[in-house]
């Protein structure tokens, strides 16, 4: 399990992020406070406070390629 902090400011960024998550073959969660949601859920992402950083949790031992693809969203 590996983690990274991100920020998503626009609807377009949320769509781009979800499109990257859909391509991986492992589970990815988003955590903010006490809420944990599936990173593939656009509606779930919009239920979070997008003004605050969000923790991305990749349930794999090697998420470096995935984190490189989403690095533009790094907080």
Segments predicted by a language model, with ranges:
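Short glycine-/aliphatic-rich beta-strand segments at the starts of folded cytosolic domains
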Residues: 1-7
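Conserved beta-strand core positions
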Residues: 4, 26-28, 54
